[in-house]
Amino acid sequence: MASDVMTKPHQLVASDRVEGTAVRRPNGDMIGHIERLMIDKVTGRVSYAILSFGGFLGIGGNLIPLPWGRLRYNTKFEAYELDVDDEELKRAPSFRADKDFDWGDRAKEAELHRYYGMPPYWGGF
């Protein structure tokens, strides 16, 4: 009997299985979910997760771009984990769901990385 490769444990996951995945705090409290991923066209690496909150903290109409390195997969919750408090989320750079973030503006991207204290995926700071 052939085994289904989707049920075998491994570290790779299809992008369509990441989109919609829950984002939780380390204690398991629900924050939101991953709306979509942003992938660097040249390197093929995931650069950002775009988070949706569905009305959480009054930021439901906005999406938050989060550097991918801020998330960790938590096998216990089968969700991505984000160690962030409510105030940090409220102040986080965001954009309206009906408009896209200006991905061509490196200064805005650099500001985003500074906010989260993470080096940009393209190098420098």
Identify the residue ranges that each predicted region occupies.
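Peripheral interaction segments used for macromolecular assembly
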Residues: 1-125
